[in-house]
Amino acid sequence: MKNISRSFWLSGALFALVASASAQIVEFRATINAAQEVPTNPSAATGSAIMIYDVASNTFDLVVSISNFPATLASSHIHEGASGVNGPVVTNFGGEAVYTRNGSTLTATFRGVTHGGTKLTLLKNGAYVNFHSSAFPGGEVRGQLIAQPKRLVANFTVAQEQAAFPAATLTGNTNAFGAAVMTYDSGTNVVNLRISLYNFPNTLTNSHFHEGAPGVSGAVVQNLGAGTVVNYARDGNSITGTFLNLTYGGDPVKLLTGGAYLNFHSNVFAGGECRGQVIASEELPGTRVANVSTRGFVGTGSQVLIGGFNITGSEPVRMLITAKGPSLSTYGVTGVLANPTLTIFDGSGRQMAQNDDVGTPAAGTELATIYGVPTSTLESALIVVLPPGNYTAIVAGSGGTFGIALLEATDLRNNATILSNRAAGATGAEGDVLAEFKRDLRAAATNLRWAAAKPTGRPEPELCVGVPLGVQAPAALAQAQAR
């Protein structure tokens, strides 16, 4: 029970720390035991520590819990040293007096502590917490501080490029835009990066990470390559890029504190057609809308299935958007759309991306591993990084096909609330339109309104809350009417 209690205590303390933290933070975790001491000792004490480190201010909050530690705590510190190596003290916490004791368990929370060591050493997992007692003055238990991957984001615009090159004639001559999401592990210096570029008809001649503040042209620190490298894929005027396990060539501190940007060069704009400052995500743990979907009839011509959603805040979101038809027959749906196509538009009506037939995803690709990708080769799917804004996804029938289709949008992030609003409809189609979702949402039936005057002969809309396809319904379902 002691370990369970410590886990709950650490979780609660972590939430309190994160809730007040700035964006430029890196989380560190440490498993504390005697086996990491040099030399090791027979102490049975074990524990955990969580640090929230603000890279910009060089300050941190730390929560610690150690059990089976009956001896008086003589002192505690952060030392600089790699795993298996003893190093000098850089930050002092104090002894027993600054901890709370409950039997043989010690706990403490330290806030706003200035780190006495070097930023880069800490970020590269080169520091550890050490707890000393009279029995083991060199340290009874210690734990290496391991950096957790940090989420970074970037929104690409022409305006950011224009600010760095005032004499250039970018604005009005290109409408390129896009976004990127990435994780950076400072301990291993590895970046996992995903890019989406839209309205980019020109040839992508090169792309890089640069170091520089907003509005400043800086040096290249990491080359990503031209649009011809295998990491990029073009479909019309949209380009997607995936770079996994990339060793970062720049300064980790600058990357984590807004001092780097992504730049995309073209044959028309050699200095860069659009760019985006890389910033640390401000995302906090919270409820996530995992999936929203709309099921309805798709006819010919203008009889399409429409889904709308809105991404709020300042950060882009990586999403899987799919159009399914043939696979619905597995769940007993009849008259399915045999060959659905999928197109995404932004709030200005600009076409961003399109897919007709996902085919058979190649082994090892993301489409082959992500849950929710269509199982029929004739269905459609797009994995995109979308900047904040309003979006519309449209499902149509290829080759004059018609029938029932399912439009789904899935958030591929962890711990995020992003879909603040969504709308669905089917133009020119009679019958029901089904909107589906996963996770906690509320439907206020009294707030449902016709966008314009209700068409003559149309029945009043009715809202029913049910269960997904293939799931047995509970004994009772909530049902409400909107009048």
Residues covered by each model-derived region:
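A sequence-level detector for low-complexity, Ser/Thr- and acidic-rich stretches
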Residues: 38, 157-179, 281-439, 443, ...
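Processing junctions and N-termini across compartments
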Residues: 17, 315, 457-458
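Sec-dependent, cleavable N-terminal signal peptides
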Residues: 1-25, 483
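N-terminal cationic leader/targeting segments used for protein routing and processing
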Residues: 3-4, 103, 238, 439, ...
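Metal-centered catalytic cores of metalloenzymes
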Residues: 23-76, 80-207, 211-284
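Extended amphipathic alpha-helical heptad-repeat regions
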Residues: 434-481
